[in-house]
Amino acid sequence: MLQLGRRLLLRVVLFKLLKKFIYWLLVILSVPLVLITRVIKPLIFIRFGYFFSDRMGHFPFDVEYYLSVLKQKSPQKYTFDYFFFVGTPCNNALVEMVRRKVRVYSAIKLLYHANNLVPNGSSHVIRPAKEINASRDIGANFQRTRRCLEFSPEEMQSGKNYLRGLGYPEDGRFVCLFVRDSIYLADVPNRDFSYHNYRDSNIDTYEKVAAALAEKGYWVFRVGKVVEYPLSIEHSRIVDYASSSDRSDLLDIWLMANCHFAISTSAGLDVYRYSLVLLF
């Protein structure tokens, strides 16, 4: 049995080494393409970049930040930017929205690494906001631009249909309650995020504010992709969407993007520029 286990381990190690060898061989074979981009730079400027797509706190922000900065610059007619995603995307609906605005191809990763092998390639690299400013809009770019990541007409209609199915009135207003807990990051394999625990809150402590808003006529949606505990309060205008079977990647974004305002614990989709009450 021990010998069989060693053989399996050896196979796994050899497979990983072979996979890595093939990848870097493809990177080296991509170097001529990179050299071509250097030669044609005076005529056509090609850049390579990436976005960390595995965390909602960085993925939409970094894309929106790139698009907002780009929008404020003079149009670069002959500049073409290409990206790839790092990590497993945290939201598939967001991936579709990003692809409508940005050229994203998995093969760009090869060209990105090939570019790094050739000297003087820094001007051909676009770093994500996560590495530049920790995904913070320090230069107030969002204040000077309209949001770039927009919903398609079909996506907008899907969100409205969801509200209509709940009996939500056409002239209604709703608030999103986005309370962070530890279960979301607990699903990330091989990573210890316990240092984020100080940001977590008990959803029960927000029941009074949810009830007060509901009594004032607001609808309150508790949002989140995965949550540790359900919302125990019951009210016709309080919806524990995060714990419901209606939850979807599209609605996760749509509700936050279209709320009247949001109540959150140091988390949220800043890219949609809604009013936000932060509680620490």
Residue ranges and their predicted role:
Residues 84, 218-224, 261-264:
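Short, hydrophobic beta-strand segments that form beta-sheet elements in well-ordered domains
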Residues 172, 177-186, 203-248:
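Catalytic donor nucleotide-activated moiety binding site of glycosyltransferases and closely related
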